[in-house]
Amino acid sequence: MFMVNLLLLIIPALIAMAFLTLTERKILGYMQFRKGPNIVGPYGMLQPIADAMKLFMKEPLLPTTSASTLYMTAPTLALSIALLMWSPLPMPHPLINFNLGLLFMLATSSLAVYSILWSGWASNSNYALIGALRAVAQTISYEVTLAIILLSTLLMSGSFNLQSLITTQEHSWLLLPSWPMAMMWFTSTLAETNRAPFDLTEGESELVSGFNIEYAAGSFALFFMAEYMNIIMMNALTTTIFLAMPYNMASSELYTMNFMTKTLLLTTLFLWIRTAYPRFRYDQLMHLLWKKFLPLTLALCMWYISMPALTSGIPPQT
């Protein structure tokens, strides 16, 4: 039964990821006054299937100077970690109900750094290595902000369990009392997933394509899939933390539809930001985190710690 539930989670997530690529190309097209993909199938709806067939049917390439084991392992690890992060997410029922679900998701997102670092080093290319080092520095830096924001929300819910976060929002979204943190969280998720305007890892003018420059065919597709799975997952987590709908046993379908709609809107916002904003310089990226976000999140965290003491109250205990 567990395997059936696992497949029922993974297959729809992969289908959603495939059509997210089509959605992005359509949004980019319309923002640039063109149609986007419209040849394969009605309105281009079969384009993701054609892309997948092309990528997975091509001959895989292995650079002669690369570290072959790490080179082949890195894309598989990237996608595996991206799929693993879905397991504790309540939609409305999680695949695995962890008491420390939020901590697990934060730790798992940190593991994604290893796949990027391995791919950059194993490719034996200067462009790939510099792109990988940029990605690692950027991801680890923004995880500091993400961790502090998560700590602040945990102080409001009183538990690391994602279900208790939903219960906390029974009367109002956490977005309302903590909107500055929500804005910083959303910006940090953009940087965490290496998306524009923070896609410094694949700055075409400097690094050609970044850490995946030596990858082609199926291995490139696995990195591509992992990136888009992480985008959907991060927006699903944002929905759970800040925009959750109270879960009622009689309305699980309604909860799922509500959850999917909010996640889709946030994901569309990710894509719209890519069309609207130019890429940051690397020093601006780090300046934004260490000199703007970090002091603000620390101050807000101290505020949420001190408020219960000042009002002689404690967070709900679960």
UniProtKB/Swiss-Prot annotation:
Subcellular location per the Swiss-Prot or TrEMBL entry: Mitochondrion inner membrane
InterPro entries from the UniProt entry: NADH_UbQ_OxRdtase_su1/FPO (IPR001694), NADH_UbQ_OxRdtase_su1_CS (IPR018086)
Keyword Metal-binding: no
One Pfam family, short name: NADHdh
Keywords: Electron transport, Membrane, Mitochondrion, Mitochondrion inner membrane, NAD, Respiratory chain, Translocase, Transmembrane, Transmembrane helix, Transport, Ubiquinone
E.C. no: 7.1.1.2
An MF annotation (GO) of this entry: NADH dehydrogenase (ubiquinone) activity
Membrane topology: Multi-pass membrane protein
Intrachain S-S bonds: none
GO cellular component, one term: mitochondrial inner membrane
Biological process according to GO: mitochondrial electron transport, NADH to ubiquinone; mitochondrial respiratory chain complex I assembly
Main enzyme class: translocase
Catalytic activity: a ubiquinone + NADH + 5 H(+)(in) = a ubiquinol + NAD(+) + 4 H(+)(out)
Transmembrane residue ranges: 2-22, 76-96, 98-118, 140-160, 171-191, 217-237, 253-273, 294-314
Keyword Magnesium on entry: no
Quaternary context: Core subunit of respiratory chain NADH dehydrogenase (Complex I) which is composed of 45 different subunits.
Membership in a protein family: Belongs to the complex I subunit 1 family.
HAMAP family: NDH1_NuoH
Function as written in the Swiss-Prot or TrEMBL entry: Core subunit of the mitochondrial membrane respiratory chain NADH dehydrogenase (Complex I) which catalyzes electron transfer from NADH through the respiratory chain, using ubiquinone as an electron acceptor. Essential for the catalytic activity and assembly of complex I.
Name of protein: NADH-ubiquinone oxidoreductase chain 1
Native source species: Ateles paniscus
Gene name of the record: MT-ND1
